[in-house]
Regions:
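Extended ligand-binding clefts on enzyme/binding-domain cores
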Residues: 103, 251, 316-327, 338-431
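Low-complexity, Ser/Thr/Pro/Gly-enriched N-terminal "stalk/linker" regions
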Residues: 2-4, 14, 18-144, 165-196, ...
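Aromatic-rich carbohydrate-recognition surfaces in CAZymes
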Residues: 196-296, 322, 477-495
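Structural helix-adjacent loops and short alpha-helical linkers that scaffold large soluble proteins
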Residues: 102-109, 211-223, 267-286, 333-353, ...
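The feature captures the catalytic groove of carbohydrate-active enzymes
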Residues: 61, 67-69, 73, 182-184, ...
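Long, well-ordered core segments of solenoidal/helical folds
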Residues: 112-127, 173-177, 215-237, 280-302, ...
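C-terminal capping/lid segments that line or modulate ligand- or cofactor-binding pockets
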Residues: 206, 250-267, 374-394, 429-499
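Active-site-adjacent structural elements in folded domains
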Residues: 188-194, 244-247, 306-316, 366-372, ...
Length: 499
């Protein structure tokens, strides 16, 4: 039975923290959340492991497993309900998925490898609702599993295309009861509780990350799944179940269409043929572009207030909503210039980009805060600078001190300067700011934040959603959005040969 889907995935355990930020912020769920927001977050899962039937289990907090390199398959298969032959077949499938991946070879090799392995495991899984108790002691891991060798990836090449669909999935083996089957390309936010949904934002970043490491087919699969769930008006719901349904009455978020187009634009920039994007995503991309043109066809040329990645209701427009709309329009322009038919000529799209950029500079500069004409800077400042777009006027100056304003004593970052002073760091925002810093030449900040993320993984090596004031991981682990951002940040460091 699915746990009660209380609102605010990334705010479930700290929703009350958002209340002091602005009188405009309203939390979903009302009195149901009174008192819950002030409970100290705890670690809900420590990582992932593939068990019998090829299903994916969350690891209990504190548990470790020695993995087959490049997979989330246990090196000792029997305690997890696998035979040696099943383990070998599933390992070939998992390694075939990542055979073409280009990952960094130096300082960040292990961090990037673990992020990719977890992201692929969370894409299209058959997911069990809770941890499995292995039939015997699990083989302890001595640290992060090494990246797969060239020999192991070469062996994976013999796996057929039909075997390379998903981490650990083998249709020849019966799955245990209770497994929730997600379709191919569906990126599950995290393996536990109210995170077992697909958020368009997370999926778009996952597609961009997979493209960045040379896994274009995986990236197209992620966007194809999103496209299958798109609303008729070209937008997206806040989140989806494994069947593509909406789990509650949470309103659709205006950023979804923008992130969908942005991710497609990243694939195009990474070398994906325009014909592939047209053939597989053409109509959904056109609907998304039409949606962005519609919501910016106003006197202000700005979208209406909407929930963004903070996932609280807003009556004042946030940078976290406005920026993805701009990024989506910019991507639509590039896609149209590459030959995709989006229902509007490239020139019209370019003119709307100019209008929206000018409107954002008029209304958010010079403070570039989270809210319109305010100084409450948050991680969305990264979205109005490289690597996302050309710098908007004055944003670079604000970005220079943004991380310091969001700093937590353990070394990570809060979602924004106005977040509750509870000492909790959030890994997706920290990873986003790391990527931003590295792209802007702020090398010390970027490497420091990446090193902090690397040092605050779980015992099994997974990236958690949060890190507490005492340095311990909290929330679910791994978190797909953080994994994607790690790949994007580390992929920006250097061009490397296939892993």
């Amino acid at each position: 039975m699915r746990p009660l889907a209380l609102p605010g995935r990334r705010r479930f355990l700290t929703l009350a923290a958002a209340v002091p930020l602005t009188a405009a912020a309203v939390l979903w769920g009302g009195s149901r959340l009174v008192g819950l927001g002030r409970r100290a977050p705890t670690l809900l899962s420590g990582g992932l492991v593939v068990g019998g039937g090829g299903v994916l289990y969350p690891l209990a907090p504190g548990d470790t497993v020695a993995y087959v390199p490049g997979t989330r398959l246990p090196r000792a298969p029997e305690p997890w309900g696998l035979t040696t032959s099943q383990q070998s077949a599933l390992a070939r499938q998992a390694l075939a998925r990542r055979q073409a991946a280009r990952l960094p070879q130096g300082r960040w090799a292990g961090l990037a490898d673990g992020a990719l392995t977890d992201l692929l495991a969370l894409t299209g899984p058959a997911l069990m609702p809770g941890p499995m108790n292995p039939a015997g002691p699990a083989e302890p891991s001595a640290g992060p599993t090494p990246a797969p060798t060239s020999a192991s990836t070469a062996d994976a090449a013999s796996a057929s295309a039909g075997d390379a669909g998903r981490e650990g999935r083998d249709s020849r083996e019966p799955q245990p009861p209770g497994a929730e089957v997600f379709p191919p390309g569906a990126v599950v936010a995290a393996p536990m509780s109210i995170w077992r949904y697909v958020w368009p934002r997370d999926a778009a970043f996952a597609a961009a990350a997979l493209s960045a490491v040379n896994l274009a087919d995986e990236a197209l699969g992620v966007l194809g799944n999103l496209a299958s769930w798109q609303r008729a008006d070209g937008g997206f719901e806040a989140r989806y179940t494994s069947s593509g349904r909406v789990p509650d009455n949470r309103p659709a978020q205006a950023d979804g269409a923008g992130w969908f187009l942005w991710a497609a634009g990243r694939l195009l920039a990474d070398g994906a043929p325009a014909a592939d994007l047209r053939d597989r995503l053409g109509a959904p991309l056109a609907r998304a572009a039409s949606r962005l043109l519609t919501i910016t066809d106003t006197p202000s040329h700005l979208p209406a207030a909407s929930p963004d990645y903070w996932e609280v209701a807003e009556t004042v427009l946030t940078l976290g909503t406005a920026a993805p709309v701009l990024l989506g329009l910019e991507a639509a322009t590039a896609l149209a210039r590459a030959g995709l038919e989006l229902g509007a000529p490239a020139q019209a799209l370019a003119e709307r980009v100019t209008a929206v950029r000018n409107a954002m500079e008029r209304n958010f500069a010079p403070a570039w805060g989270r809210h319109l004409r305010r100084d409450d800077v948050d991680a969305a400042i990264a979205l109005v600078l490289p690597p996302f777009t050309r710098p908007l006027a004055g944003a670079r100056t604000v970005r220079q001190t943004a991380a310091a304003r969001m700093h937590r004593p353990t070394g990570g970052l809060a979602p924004g300067a106005g977040w509750r002073d509870d000492g909790v760091s959030w890994t997706p925002e920290t990873a986003l700011m790391a990527w931003s810093a590295l792209s802007l030449g702020m090398e010390e900040e970027g490497t420091r934040l990446l090193a902090w993320l690397e040092a605050h993984r779980t015992a099994a090596g997974a990236l958690p959603e949060k890190v507490l004031a005492d340095g311990s991981p909290a929330g679910p682990a791994p978190l797909a959005w953080t994994c994607a951002l790690i790949l994007l940040a580390t992929a920006s460091r250097a061009e490397t040969p296939p892993s």
